[in-house]
């Protein structure tokens, strides 16, 4: 059978910005050992040096893969964005080189939905206003004007607008 790939120890992965340890563990479990891992983002010069012989790069949103950086990557095969977007990658430059760019579009939709629901409850219960008053030394123990979401018919007591765009919508 013909050899269709480099040996696993010859394939270099560059992981920056503290990509989750599960990615590192998965690569190692699959037999890849040539992994360069950085907890933070690299400046342009460091990035150009590290990416020069990398086959794959995994990044989050702080690292910007400009056309100059992509052109410095002599062996780059794919770019993995461990986040929702790809706006940190010059997609045209990657396309010119035939380098696919992947992302994780649903990676935090549950977190965003939970945050929105939590903030909605905070607003409905008047927590920001009560917090501001408490910081000014005012503690209002009266229940007048308070609101609980449970068991309420919101149409009569409040107007709730749920407007969302993107994958969380």
Segments from the language model and where they lie:
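Conserved N-terminal Rossmann-fold NAD(P)-binding element of oxidoreductases
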Residues: 15-16, 154-158
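An N-terminal-biased, well-structured beta-alpha scaffold segment characteristic
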Residues: 1-102
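Aromatic pocket-lining residues of Rossmann-like dinucleotide-binding sites
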Residues: 167-169
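Phosphate-binding beta-alpha-beta segment of Rossmann-like dinucleotide-binding domains, i.e.
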Residues: 97-156, 165
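N-terminal Rossmann-fold NAD(P) dinucleotide-binding loop
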Residues: 20, 160-165
């Amino acid at each position: 059978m013909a050899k269709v790939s480099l040996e696993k120890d010859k394939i270099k992965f560059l992981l920056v910005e503290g990509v989750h340890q599960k990615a590192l563990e998965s690569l190692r479990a699959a037999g890849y050992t040539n992994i360069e891992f950085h907890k933070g983002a690299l400046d342009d010069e460091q990035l150009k040096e590290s990416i020069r012989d990398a086959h794959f790069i995994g990044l989050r949103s702080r690292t910007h893969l400009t056309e100059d950086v992509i052109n410095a990557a002599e062996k780059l095969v794919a770019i993995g964005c461990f986040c929702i977007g790809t706006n940190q990658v010059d997609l045209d430059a990657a396309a010119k080189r035939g380098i696919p760019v992947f992302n994780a579009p649903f990676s935090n939709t549950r977190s965003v939905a939970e945050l929105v629901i939590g903030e909605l409850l905070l607003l409905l219960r008047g927590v920001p206003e009560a917090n501001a008053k408490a910081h000014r030394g005012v503690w209002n123990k009266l229940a007048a004007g308070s609101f609980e979401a449970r068991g309420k018919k919101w149409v009569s007591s409040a107007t709730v607008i749920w407007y969302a765009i993107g994958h969380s919508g």
